[in-house]
Each structure stands twice: as C-alpha cells, then as structure tokens.
Amino acid sequence: MLPTAVLLVLAVSVAARDNATCDGPCGLRFRQKLESGMRVVGGMSAEPGAWPWMVSLQIFMYHNNRRYHTCGGILLNSHWVLTAAHCFKNKKKVTDWRLIFGANEVVWGSNKPVKPPLQERFVEEIIIHEKYVSGLEINDIALIKITPPVPCGPFIGPGCLPQFKAGPPRAPQTCWVTGWGYLKEKGPRTSPTLQEARVALIDLELCNSTRWYNGRIRSTNVCAGYPRGKIDTCQGDSGGPLMCRDRAENTFVVVGITSWGVGCARAKRPGVYTSTWPYLNWIASKIGSNALQMVQLGTPPRPSTPAPPVRPPSVQTPVRPPWYFQRPPGPSQQPGSRPRPPAPPPAPPPPPPPPPPPPPPPPPPPQQVSAKPPQALSFAKRLQQLIEALKGTAFSSGRSYYETETTDLQELPAS
C-alpha cells in the first residue's frame, strides 16, 4: 500500500512540474464540450479552460494605463506565443503590448491587474517573418517572446503544431476556431467572452476560384468556413488558432493562424489562415528544434532528438570505463596512452646507447694498440732499472713512476 501511495505522489509531482514548465502534453482541453459551438461570428461562448493555449494580445495605453484586446495568439511553451504578423502593423514596440493567459473573459479597456488563475505578462521580443508582405498578407506569421516566462496550470497549457510529415491540412475536415473578435462584421467592439465555432476546411482550388478569392490564395494559406458563410472569424480574432482534432491522440493541432478575409461570414468568402506546417522550420529556427518537437504530436519526431544524444555516448565509448575518469591514475593513463606515440621518445634513449658503444670500440682499439708500445717500453725500462739497481746503479728514489717513464728512453735498447 505504501509503495502505491509513494508512486502516486511521485506521479502527481512530475505532472505538476511538467505543467508548471509547460513541458507536458500539448493540445489537451481541460473543459471539453464540443457539441456547444454549432454556429467568433455564428459561434458560441466557450467554457473556461476549454482552449488553454488561447492568448489575448492587448495594446497598453500609457495615458490611461488601460489594456485593449486586439489579437489572439497561441501559447507554445512558457517562453513563446505564435500569432499573426499583421497584428503589429501599427504597434511594433514591445512596451505597447500586454499578454493575458488563461482568460475566458476579457474586459475592454481594463486598468486592473488580472486575478488567478489568469496570468499577465510583458513582451520581451517580437519576431515578424522576414518576408512578411503587408497588404497581401504573405508570410503572415510572428512570434512573441514572453517575459517573465508564464507557468502552465489548470487554465493555461501549450497548443500543438503539426508534424513535419503531416503535410498541409486537407479538406474535407471539420476544425475549430476561437477568439474574442467581433460578433458581427461591423460590431462596435470585440466579444468579452471567448467564442468558439466549428468550420470546415475548404479545398484551396475552390477557395482560389474566380467566384471565390480569384487567385489571392497561396499555397501557404488554409481556407476554412462554409460556402454559404454565416460562421467565420472576424476582426479581433487575428492571430488566433485554427485547430483540427487528431483522433489518434485525441488532441487538437493548430493547423492555421487567423490571417484575413473579405468581410465576416460572407458567402464564398471564408476565413483565410496562415498554414503552420510550411513554417515549422522557421519556428524551429527561432524557438529551437527541441522546443518545437515538444509541441508536435506523436513519438516519431521526438526520438529524433534522443537519437543524437545516443551518438554522444557512442563517441564516448572509447573512454567508456568510468574508472578512467574517476581515479587519478586513470586520467594520467589515458593522456599517457595518447603519448604512446611519444613511446618513441623512450625508443630514442635506446638508440643513443647503441651509437655510444660503436664509437668507443673503434677508438679504444687504436688507443690500446698505440698505448701498448709505451707500456711495453716502460715495463722494459723498469726491468732494466731493477737490473741496474741490483747492479748498484739505481735512480734517485725521489722520482715518480711518471718521471721514470719519461726519462732516458734511449737506454731501452741497451736492455
């Protein structure tokens, strides 16, 4: 019983840690009520926590310290929000913006701090796609860096992005849009409550036909709505998500970012979205490939990161024995093992001994040969001196052996 309780505590702590750092599963709804939204324009109010990755981008006015909702965004992790580039046409300074997380209702022109579980954050950096074309809304995508990082919780969680192998979203498919935008085309202001609605993906060729958008749709766009209109995103929904359910994972994947449209909910004028799939590499180049893989469904892409980490162990296999590093002699042995090429330095000492012996042998023989005659002569002379001493004609006793060897050499033949 005790081990089970311990395991439950550990599981809860791990889940809480992942939730706090936004490293947990992406695309999970905390409050699911999919049958509610049958009709943004034509939508219905969402339940609190239904879309935890929804972010409210609000312009901050310094003259009255009030915030005004302007665009939506998608939370990717504690540091990054994905949105549309055209949201920053008029306000490009980071100090002009505030980010509200976990909200279901937003107050237009509020000057009060948000209350938990909502979180308010500043903008550290705005990254607009380098090839964004205003007016034509080409490459209408941007990233916002959050400061300080926002923790995830019951009403705040990361959204999912498609896998690289997924390809662009294809019709027919029913997906979802959300936002605090206008409830009708010429509404007075944005909706105070988050709206949700079902929309159908529309084939790009049909959407680009002469009676629809007549060539204005690009391959990096997604069209969603209905031929008859009536349900659509509108002003104030820009930057928000177009989400399709992944039935295998039972999660939602953000396949598009609300970009533009002609009017709101008009017939044959569906909402136009920036497809997220063509920009996965761009997103990875800004937030990092590991951060991107954390918000991509499925295991195939994630093992691609463990695979490189496996290579480092393989690189370390030559020094795999741990004691090489843990013991002091170990490190010295390994550096010494590389100096095995310096083992020739010990070899050079052996070569010196052989050369010295050869030179000494040749010199000594000639020296010994030349020295023998003087030694023979000295011995003969000594013998002669001994004989002469016996005869009574001895040398003075004060001379050394060296002096005797160097004097009277001519007397040698007399012996």
Curated annotation (Swiss-Prot):
Keyword Transferase listed: no
Propeptide segments, given as residue ranges: 339-415
Signal peptide: 1-16
Cystine bridges: 22-152, 26-160, 71-87, 175-244, 207-223, 234-264
Record-annotated active site: 86, 140, 238
GO molecular function: amidase activity; D-mannose binding; fucose binding; serine-type endopeptidase activity; serine-type peptidase activity
E.C. no: 3.4.21.10
Region (Disordered): 296-376, 395-415
Enzyme class of the recorded protein, top EC level: hydrolase
Protein keywords: Disulfide bond, Glycoprotein, Hydrolase, Protease, Serine protease, Signal, Zymogen
Annotated ranges, domain Peptidase S1: 40-288
UniProt activity-regulation remark: Inhibited by SERPINA5.
Listed Pro residues bias regions: 300-312, 328-367
Catalysed reactions, as listed in the record: Preferential cleavage: Arg-|-Xaa, Lys-|-Xaa
Assigned GO CC terms: acrosomal matrix; protein-containing complex
A Gene Ontology biological process term: proteolysis
A Pfam family: Trypsin
Sites where a glycan is attached: 19, 208
Biased composition annotated in UniProt, kind: Polar residues: 395-409
Subunit: Heavy chain (catalytic) and a light chain linked by two disulfide bonds. Forms a heterodimer with SERPINA5.
Function as written in the Swiss-Prot or TrEMBL entry: Acrosin is the major protease of mammalian spermatozoa. It is a serine protease of trypsin-like cleavage specificity, it is synthesized in a zymogen form, proacrosin and stored in the acrosome.
Family: Belongs to the peptidase S1 family.
Name used for this protein in its record: Acrosin
Species name: Sus scrofa (Pig)
Encoding gene, per UniProt annotation: ACR
